[in-house]
Amino acid sequence: MLRDGKNEGMSTIPGFNQIQFEGFCRFIDQGLTEELYKFPKIEDTDQEIEFQLFVETYQLVEPLIKERDAVYESLTYSSELYVSAGLIWKTGRDMQEQTIFFGNIPLMNSLGTSIVNGIYRIVINQVLQSPGIYYRSELDHNGISVYTGTIISDWGGRSELEIDRKARIWARVSRKQKISILVLSSAMGSNLREILENVCYPEIFLSFLTDKEKKKIGSKENAILEFYQQFACVGGDPVFSESLCKELQKKFFQQRCELGRIGRRNMNRRLNLDISQNNTFLLPRDILAAADHLIGMKFGMGTLDDMNHLKNKRIRSVADLLQDQFGLALVRLENVVRGTICGALRHKLIPTPQNLVTSTPLTTTYESFFGLHPLSQVLDRTNPLTQIVHGRKLSYLGPGGLTGRTASFRIRDIHPSHYGRICPIDTSEGINVGLIGSLAIHARIGRWGSLESPFYEISERSKGARMLYLSPGKDEYYMVAAGNSLALNQGIQEEQVVPARYRQEFLTIAWEQVHLRSIFSFQYFSIGASLIPFIEHNDANRALMSSNMQRQAVPLSRSEKCIVGTGLERQAAIDSGALAIAEHEGKIIYTDTDKILLSGNGNTLSIPLVIYQRSNKNTCMHQKPQVQRGKCIKKGQILAHGAATVGGELALGKNVLVAYMPWEGYNFEDAVLISERLVYEDIYTSFHIRKYEIKTHVTSQGPERVTNEIPHLEAHLLRNLDKNGIVMLGSWVETGDILVGKLTPQMVKESSYAPEDRLLRAILGIQVSTSKETCLKLPIGGRGRVIDVRWIQKRGGSSYNPEMIRVYISQKREIKVGDKVAGRHGNKGIISKILPRQDMPYLQDGRPVDMVFNPLGVPPRMNVGQIFECSLGLAGGLLDRHYRIAPFDERYEQEASRKLVFSELYEAGKQTANPWVFEPEYPGKSRIFDGRTGDPFEQPVIIGKPYILKLIHQVDDKIHGRSSGHYALVTQQPLRGRAKQGGQRVGEMEVWALEGFGVAHILQEMLTYKSDHIRARQEVLGTTIIGGTIPNPQDAPESFRLLVRELRSLALELNHFFVSEKNFQINRKEA
């Protein structure tokens, strides 16, 4: 929370999860009621019985289970919905009223997420084109401007109005078909006289009114038939009927003419209409007014619309998505109730409201939505920052939106209306760049689905601060002072001339002309970009990489908060939910690793802590108590720190001593040289938890059994199993060990037994095992300590809900060669070598550096902010200070960042009596020495303490080797991929490279022994064991045989022949 003395309320940053909470609360408070009111009264075919809902008395019950239990048992954290319903007999005027169970609605927890089947899921906000009308101009093949007006419905359907060279207006209802606007207006219910009375240019409409057109619009029925014929592309003469009208209503009017409340508001504002907001359908009056504006465009009146402007977009929030799904569930329930009433009367049964309603439609609709909808995603829980940022994403993709392959560059680009609403930096990389953005820290969603940004109003009459939230279209009418002018300090005399924005242009104006100013210098950035210190000195592409890489940082076993930050670290940690915070004041009466007992107001509150919990990225989420027994605490005080948090602040990495210099080529191309101190002192050690699970089913031959008596397996592999056949807690397991012993029964014929088995059965009566071993084994690359075993029993004894056993294994990973590290300025690299600390370059006080970066990685990438952070971090480490600097500090004075860094370095050198910290000849640099020889390097080197992160891309998850494994059935070549223990493909270009070097024997091995020559690869193993020479393959490999078979399928016979060396006879041999 950032405050200014005068304007405390204005300077408070809103909660980062607020957008999710507000959306869900709006759904519970308004969306449920709106959809329930739409539920119709249902009558039977004889209209004797009527079913209706009494919406005023619906209630949501408190969940029966806790969040932790839902995660543990793979259940949904939901609330039961109960609604009063009545059944009315019209003949006797009797009514039976009951409170019925409608189904379960998943609830949102304190993190802004939902727990569905034990998995944390989050709903992403979607950016859609706002319903309404938009005017555009395009050039035809002759270079002449063609003006069109596009009407977009609430469903996303589009209809176009266009005007040709002869000033005739057409309505295009499909890509190929277009009809006269007179026909469309007549089909919607207007006659010719009403049309001419409601337009501004009746003479233009009369100019293309031919006798043929008059016949088409002579009556409403003729207009509907003409419209249907053009819309449905139907030949002949269709006959007017009720079914034809219903088809038009369903296919055209419902999908393309329903504007909704937002569309009606936009249509009224764009066309200057005064139609009621409750009238949400497209009217003939709208069509005629749109045609008038289109004619005005043709003659140079009016302005065209920018489709990419945020005022023409709307946010489809969590509330809208959940409300749409609830409405869909009610439609399904309506069909069920209608069918049940008819069925009950047909069988002469007396229905009750309880019997008519089933909870299946609502429950299954939400389960399928959270599990299958593209905007419902599994919560990324790599670190606390990732959890917050994921809920603040804005996606142009999804149902009704764009696709990554068809979106143009203009849509992906930054727009001036994004200022203060969508971060211009934080977006995904790759095919979805510009299509998935992030919400700015101060932005909020308005009433009409628009993104609003706060501004500080400058008023001469009142000296008090007043903050305005403006939608995208409104701030263009004000002179808005840019972010480099002072926004907080009211006592400083303002500059006479300031840069400002006005109508998407940047101007330089006098201070007296400014209407609005920014709240903060980083109010237009997302959370990820706002955590980058000195971001103003970086190229935007590198800042984008940094925003993404901070979300990939692994929580370390010993976290450390950054020396140089921006001030948002504390709020990011608090809003992430990683910390345990006191909800009431009181006294600590007990602390333990798994809970804290707080006594206050006569009650004792138990606060559970997270103990070694696995995230979906296999990182470790853990909380450590920070309070002692007997201490009195206040509301809001931190009780326990979580993963990647220290002192209530976000702590994703470590402050390490870094030198920017080349070292024997080991930091070539962004490689990083590190000291062994980072390994032995567990500086970058992290814990990772993997989950392995197995289910027990009931087969046709009988149930599967979990047991520790597994035949034909070595006792060494079963050493960790308990008497139930499940691995014991605390066991150390290696690759190939049995985690859960399981036997599956199978049908075995008498003839398939081995002779010795049949002999044992005949003589001794010993039953031979007929079960197949289907144990859960630890796969390749897995090793560690078993920290948890969960045996989830099936509920209700149903065979369709099998038992599930989950084993959680913790793995300790030190930093090693091949791991990826990164700074906060897009400077990333791979560990290339780990040097002994005595060989690392050392400073003038004898301290060896921890990392060596390549200095050539800074100038071409233009991320100079890392140099400022590096030098300021060195000063902070020597002075034991932490700096929190807001970006764009040059608004105070020129070269403010450089002056701050140099002054702190000078003070650090003065207080610690180390003059080498700041040397005026080369400030920020220092003479350092080679650890191998003790000689100083030729040039002074930049040294410092930047904040370096260890990323999730680790070599243990990627390194792979294959000696033997599975082969594809058709080609007999090794499979592909690490998960399948696959091989590496030697393709066409690799063969060319080997041919170019003339390595014939290596090439033959690659194409035969190591690939798809079945007999040759079987002989290799034996000859390798006995030390013999590998025999040359005598026949063709399997890939050549496959080619021959494919040619035979095309009726082409291919054979090869051998010519005898003795008599030169040709011997034919089958391929």
UniProtKB/Swiss-Prot annotation:
Primary residence: plastid
One Pfam family recorded for the sequence: RNA_pol_Rpb2_2
GO molecular function, one term: DNA-directed RNA polymerase activity
Annotated localization: Plastid, Chloroplast
Documented EC number(s): 2.7.7.6
Keyword Plastid among record annotations: yes
Keywords: Chloroplast, DNA-directed RNA polymerase, Nucleotidyltransferase, Plastid, Transcription, Transferase
InterPro entries from the UniProt entry: DNA-dir_RNA_pol_bsu_ext_1_sf (IPR042107), DNA-dir_RNA_pol_su2 (IPR015712), DNA-dir_RNAP_su2_dom (IPR007120), DNA-dir_RNAP_su2_hyb_sf (IPR037033), RNA_pol_bsu_bac (IPR010243), RNA_pol_bsu_CS (IPR007121), RNA_pol_Rpb2_2 (IPR007642), RNA_pol_Rpb2_2_sf (IPR037034)
GO CC entries: chloroplast; DNA-directed RNA polymerase complex; mitochondrion
Disulfide bonds: none
Presence of the UniProt keyword Transferase in the record: yes
Cited NCBIfam families: PRK00405.1
Subunit-level organization: In plastids the minimal PEP RNA polymerase catalytic core is composed of four subunits: alpha, beta, beta', and beta''. When a (nuclear-encoded) sigma factor is associated with the core the holoenzyme is formed, which can initiate transcription.
The protein's role, per its UniProt record: DNA-dependent RNA polymerase catalyzes the transcription of DNA into RNA using the four ribonucleoside triphosphates as substrates.
Protein name per Swiss-Prot or TrEMBL: DNA-directed RNA polymerase subunit beta
Organism lineage string: Eukaryota, Viridiplantae, Streptophyta, Embryophyta, Tracheophyta
